[in-house]
Regions:
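Short, low-complexity disordered leader/linker segments with a strong preference
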Residues: 1-28, 59
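Signal peptide-proximal N-terminal region
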Residues: 24, 47-70, 190-196
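Extracytoplasmic "Venus flytrap"
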Residues: 30-49, 73-80, 102-103, 171-180, ...
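Beta-alpha junction/loop-to-helix N-cap segments that form part of ligand/metal-binding clefts
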Residues: 41-48, 62-133, 144, 203-211, ...
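Extracellular/periplasmic Venus flytrap/periplasmic-binding protein
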Residues: 81-84, 128-130, 138-245, 288-294
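Periplasmic-binding protein-like
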Residues: 89, 93-102, 120-124, 169-172, ...
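Extracellular/periplasmic periplasmic-binding protein-like sensory domains
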Residues: 242-320, 331-332
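Segments of small-molecule ligand-sensing domains
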Residues: 302-317, 323-370
Length: 370
């Protein structure tokens, strides 16, 4: 039902543009993203952000005289499924570009598809360093988020400030993102606070139905603080199970989660069950600041109107920024040829509702603050 509704929104957005307003066929953007399962809580808002950007751009005449058409597909947060639907989008639907995926299992796999087909692929959220490290980067992959090295450094810097913390544990999903994030954190923490001992590391799978064994195992090691990379439905399930067991109270709420759970999405899902006093980040931290840029206010108002939600998602902005970046690349290249667009995007700066961003020439990332 959710997928049908999102596809309907995309069609409705396209219908708002008068017929005959464009000189040529649409620029097709394939959008593999989780629209079902525990990660849909993020996947759906990311897609909605992209759809909003496309709607606004089309209302202003499109790009190079052509409208944008987003073709969403449910990747199910699974690498094989993300590859399958991406190839189908390229071969069957003839998409010009790929934008999407959510996890660091999907994105590296789709990056390979993009390389094989010489098609630009923008990953809105995948953070694993493997996506853009020197051994794996290719000319067609770009990322509008930061990476796990930055994430781990930030978490370690904050953790190191707690002078009374002597023992630390980690809990992260058992795949590239979680492993990379925890490793980066531990590496930096050892530099900053060599006196701290890592007493436990737990590795639940994505979509873990019951976190109780991991929670009780970690509590038995009596850490003073915890670093986590749990996200989406996993963080929601974990929090609901951990709080009654006294998990957060046992560590005096010294819990840092680097997986963007400091958002309205989790607050809405958990309500009063949201764990008090924890520290986390957000793809759209401007939501919580007093000095909100005018452009961001406009974006939030437009997003609420588009989604008919009372509270704007903290994840939609990365989908929105991905389309903005792609469109600027197309305009700079004055072409939809991926080789030309990819070259145009190297070192390119682009405007977003939270300020300018720029793709690194070396790593194709924006290192966006969160």
């Amino acid at each position: 039902m959710q997928l049908r509704r999102l596809i309907a929104w995309a069609a409705a957005a396209a219908a708002l543009v008068p017929a005959g307003a464009f000189a040529a066929g649409p620029i097709k953007i394939g959008f593999p993203i989780p629209l079902s399962g525990v990660t849909a809580v993020y996947g759906v808002p990311v897609l909605q952000g992209a759809q909003l950007a496309a709607k606004e751009i089309n209302a202003k005449g499109g790009v190079l005289g052509r409208k944008l058409e987003i073709l969403p597909r449910d990747s199910k947060a699974n690498a094989d499924e993300a590859v399958r639907v991406s190839r189908e989008l390229i071969i069957k639907n003839g998409v010009d570009f790929l934008v999407g995926t959510l996890t660091s299992a999907e994105a590296p796999a789709v990056s390979t598809v993009a390389k094989e087909n010489h098609i630009v692929f923008i990953a809105p959220t995948s953070k694993s360093t493997i996506l853009t490290d020197p051994q794996h980067i290719n000319p067609y992959i770009f990322r509008v988020s930061s990476n796990t090295d930055v994430e781990g450094l930030a978490g370690a810097t904050l953790m190191a400030r707690w002078k009374n913390v002597k023992t630390v544990a980690t809990i992260a999903p058992d795949y590239a993102y979680g492993r990379d994030s925890a490793a980066a954190f531990v590496k930096e923490l050892k530099k900053l606070r060599p006196d701290i001992k890592i007493v436990d590391q737990e590795w639940p799978k994505v979509g873990q139905p019951d976190f109780t064994p991991f929670i009780t195992a970690q509590m038995s090691k009596k850490p003073d603080a915890v670093y986590a990379s749990l996200f989406a439905g996993d963080f929601i399930t974990f929090s609901k199970e951990a709080k009654p067991l006294g998990y957060f109270k046992a560590i005096d709420n010294r819990f840092i989660d680097a997986a963007e759970v400091g958002t309205t999405d989790e607050a809405k899902a958990l309500g009063a069950e949201y764990p008090f006093g924890i520290i986390s980040d957000s793809y759209d931290p401007v939501i919580f600041t007093k000095n909100e840029p005018p452009g961001h206010k406009q974006f939030i108002a437009a997003l609420k109107a588009f989604t008919h939600e009372k509270y704007a998602s903290g994840w939609s902005i990365v989908g929105y920024q991905s389309i903005e970046a792609l469109v600027d690349g197309i305009r700079k290249a004055h072409s939809t040829n991926s080789d030309k667009v990819a070259k145009a995007m190297l070192g390119m700066s682009f405007d977003t509702p939270v300020g300018k961003r720029m793709f690194s020439v070396k790593s194709h990332e924006t290192f966006a603050p969160e």
